[in-house]
Amino acid sequence: MLTHKTCQARKKMQVSFVIRDAEEKQHRNGVNALQLDANNGKLYSAGRDAIIRVWNTRTESNEKYIQSMEHHNDWVNDIVLCCNGRNLISASCDTTVKVWNAQKGFCMSTLRTHRDYVQALAYAKDREQVASAGLDKAIFLWDVNTLTALTASNNTVTTSSLTGSKDSIYSLAMNPSGTVIVSGSTENILRIWDPRTCMRSMKLRGHTENVRCLVVSPDGNQVVSGSSDGTIKVWNLGQQRCVQTIHVHKEGVWSLLMSENFQYIISGSRDRNIIVTEMRNPSNKMLVCEEQAPVLSLGYNIDKTGVWATTWNSDIRCWKLPMYDRCTLNSSGGLDAQWTQGGTELACIKGGAAIKECTVLNDKRYIITKDSQDQVVVYDVLRVVKKEQLGAVDYEAEVKKRNKQVYIPNWFTVDLKTGMPTIVLGQEEVDCFAAWVSIEAGLPECVDPTTEIKINYGKLLLEALLEHWTPHNMPPNDMDQDMHGNGYFQVPKHTPVIFSEVGGRTVCRLLVRDAAGDSESTLLQETAPQWVTDVVIEKNIPKFLKIPFFLQPHPQMTKPERTKKDRLVANEFIQCRKVCEHVLEKVLNAETTPSGGNANNSLQNSQSDANSEGSQLPAEERIELWCNDVVVDPNMDLRTVRHFIWKQSTDLTFQYKTKQNFNYDGK
């Protein structure tokens, strides 16, 4: 017996968020699973965009959307309705199993027992028991009545474990009375347990590839399986063997649906076909339809005259089922058996487009995306908004047009797995505090022309995402307005923010606007990593990144005897005009007119006291900097020169020379 608790061990963490609309009424990626509540006509769909949506299938209107159920942050792989439609259980690639109030659409509790993707669920209606399984090779049994009674104070639940699986589990099935549970895995075999005793009773061999879908007969005597090997097999558990192999698909069988009398199989395949087959006589089969993409799941409509189907695409379609009629009178007076016409599209729930391509622009603030409908969009990562809808334009041309010759370090990564842009901030391979820029470049709308402020993109964004969070242990006198936000901008309050282990499990998910809540604030205190609280709560400034470089005279200098080569260190965002000022003031000992800001020998704070009336030209108009035989733009910063011009792993090297209209000896 294992015990689940909500506390988490402290591990390396990352923060991610999704740039999206406040309400996403359409699936933005494939749909993995369906559940129909025949009592009220509600269809529940589990999306690869991490959202469960509810649809009204009784209306003939195109607007079937009822609500979204959001708390996962990765593919939702399977769902089951239980308790006569009052509750719903979901399984996700975020490694969690969640319990939902199906009527109101909110998450009641989260189970974190699995250690990897949770791929499949099975439900025993008569016992109100659910089983979950996934890539961690584990199967857990849950009492639904216990799960639905969990509260913030009563948050511990006991589960039974079915052991023995040696590979990742992709399919799971149970009969209504809960006497048999079957799993299918990449072992290519079926394992059978008695969930009442948690004892394994047998394993069945026959498939040659992963077992992707399973159905158990109500009496628990038969199992039908579909495999990536393209076959459907019928198994007799009493005889412990395969009694029939059905070949009706050209590629893997990913979804199965049985008729109530367990005589007809409806199968959906990677070959995009949905086929009805008589189990006792597989030659009696009928193509229902050819879908637009590989079929992921199937489910009956209310009166079972049609079947809802989902695919890799985001649309959900209902197809009319053909019926097998054994009582058709032929011309000679005998009886023939034939299929009635099916395959008509009865309804369609349209989905949205999934983002398939993404380019981070050189300024490391904007990304350009292209979706499955060839629509190109520009997103502002810093402000967490869609900036511009460009339409069906040339994607590569737009990237080229908008990319500036500027280098800013990577400070985030983009994940497109859900079909929407998920931005990931961390401290591992990519440091989210790496991007220091001038406020003029990063936030031109906030520029004060009398100052030269440097801003850190990662710091500003974290402060905006957690603007509403006030830790409980902060003294009241410290909680003034200056402690909240970044002072420049806010991000959309509907933005989901996710704290997760690096390369692993989700620990906390909340919306920006909800961070002020008591439970959310407590959860943030328990889960937010130190590098987040340092900048958001303690208001610490991230460290500047520095670049070493050499400075030497150009061969064309009028004083060739000056050959000294100086090694300097400066903040990487220092502009080359500061290097020009340093050359004039410290190397050539000339009077300068600073272009603003400060610089000293290390170029951190350069400020010349010499500002005579006879030297009014700024340094960049009197000094040329060269790198790799290229004249350097004084507006470039050091990191941009190193990336685009120097292009070497060795220390950056500048050569300087005076322009023709300036003689440093003529002071």
Swiss-Prot record:
Q: Where is this region: Disordered?
A: 591-615
Q: Name one GO molecular function term.
A: ubiquitin binding
WD repeats: from-to residues: 26-65, 71-110, 113-152, 164-203, 206-245, 248-287, 290-329, 350-389
**What does the entry give for GO biological process?**
double-strand break repair via homologous recombination
Has keyword Repeat? yes
- InterPro entries, A to Z: G-protein_beta_WD-40_rep, WD40/YVTN_repeat-like_dom_sf, WD40_repeat_CS, WD40_repeat_dom_sf, WD40_rpt, WDR48, WDR48/Bun107
Keywords from the UniProt entry: Repeat, Ubl conjugation pathway, WD repeat
Q: What does this protein do?
A: Regulatory component of the Usp12-46 deubiquitylase complex. activates deubiquitination by increasing the catalytic turnover without increasing the affinity of deubiquitinating enzymes for the substrate. The complex deubiquitylates the wg/wingless-signaling receptor arr/arrow, which stabilizes the receptor and increases its concentration at the cell surface; this enhances the sensitivity of cells to wg/wingless-signal stimulation.
State how it assembles: Catalytic component of the Usp12-46 deubiquitylase complex consisting of Usp12-46, Wdr20 and Uaf1; regulatory subunit that, together wtih Wdr20, stabilizes Usp12-46. The Usp12-46 deubiquitylase complex associates with arr/arrow; the interaction leads to deubiquitination and stabilization of arr/arrow.
Stated family: Belongs to the WD repeat WDR48 family.
Name the record gives this protein: WD repeat-containing protein 48 homolog
Q: What is the organism of origin for this protein?
A: Drosophila ananassae
Organismal lineage: Eukaryota, Metazoa, Ecdysozoa, Arthropoda, Hexapoda
* Name of the gene: Uaf1
